Amino acid sequence: MEQTWRWYGPNDPVSLDDVRQAGATGVVTALHHIPNGEIWSVEEIEKRKAELKAKGLVWSVVESVPVHEEIKTQTGNYQQHIANYQQSLRNLAQCGIDTVCYNFMPVLDWTRTDLEYALPDGSKALRFDHIAFAAFELHILQRNGAEKDYTADEQAQAADYYRMMSEDDIARLTGNIIAGLPGSEEGYTLEQFRGRLAEYDGIDHAKLREHLAHFLREIVPVAEAAGLRLAIHPDDPPRSILGLPRVMSTIDDMRWLKQTVDSLHNGFTFCTGSYGVRVDNDLVNMLETFADRVHFTHLRATCREENPNSFHEGAHLQGDVDMVAIINAILAEELRRQKAGDRRPIPMRPDHGHQMLDDLKKKTNPGYSAIGRLKGLAELRGVELALKCTRFTELQQG
């Protein structure tokens, strides 16, 4: 596996020197300063590459080239946004970058309710509390029809939760959900958020799939011609929220994507933490079934709670993900590719570390503090080395 590290650009509290000291050789980054829908120019791409090269690092994966909301809703200037996306892909390929992660989640990117969930050892994790989210939907956002998504017991719990909230609690929960987490290119006020949700009135799961299919038919041929690997990221959490459809949450969704545009350039970012939230997702089977289409991996573990729709981020080798089995499957695919003549390792990054040690005293990007990810990368590296020394000696020699 290629050991990579997500970096949010010059304003990231974690420096490129820190990244190099962590032992990563590749960087996963994006041009966050370019507005959604605009073309990434060769000049801007080369500028970022030069920043990385000066520190002895390479730009391994783009995460992400954001998909404009008008593409998802097929409104406004969506065809122009697609044309701009195509040109950005060509420009990235011209600059030697061959793997692009993206997602097709409506309105919100990844979603959490608590960014400072205290763990027993004193470190902090990210958490999605289903009842807190229900309190937001039912009593703060007051979304029409939201009660249909919750049982009577959950509605009662949400009402109790809301009654106990202070004004600061309400502001914090609202901000955590709609203000934009790291990697999200857009944040909203409450009124803007209601307006965004309204844009999806009449767009159900089938319709959003149609829109994704149209997008894929437009961009996959460009990726094929340019030698780019596209890697769609799963929904996080992997189910419908806020009445919005989600189209990349299960093995059936993965199968649909492959069948819709059957090309090796139309592939997946296999995020174990996102897919792993669902108890019905067999991660190893999903990975092995679509191994030849997995172009990028996010390795992290989540811990489902008493309410199975609630979860928090676990340590990388703990929680509900069998990380040893996952890495074993990744290495098996790497060996298969190597025997077929493709010696490129599959890029992997340690996803979402705990905030711990000295980072507890610092301002950090939620989920992306340095020390927690350093710990995760070291643990994942150890599993990889152990498997290479015992089961995949051909890769060790390679």
Swiss-Prot record:
Keywords: Iron, Lyase, Manganese. The keyword Endoplasmic reticulum does not apply. The lineage of its organism: Bacteria, Pseudomonadati, Pseudomonadota, Gammaproteobacteria, Enterobacterales. The keyword Ribosomal protein does not apply. One of its GO terms (biological process) is D-glucuronate catabolic process. It comes from Pectobacterium atrosepticum (strain SCRI 1043 / ATCC BAA-672) (Erwinia carotovora subsp. atroseptica). Its cofactor is Fe(2+); Mn(2+). Pfam families: UxuA (PF03786). This is Mannonate dehydratase.
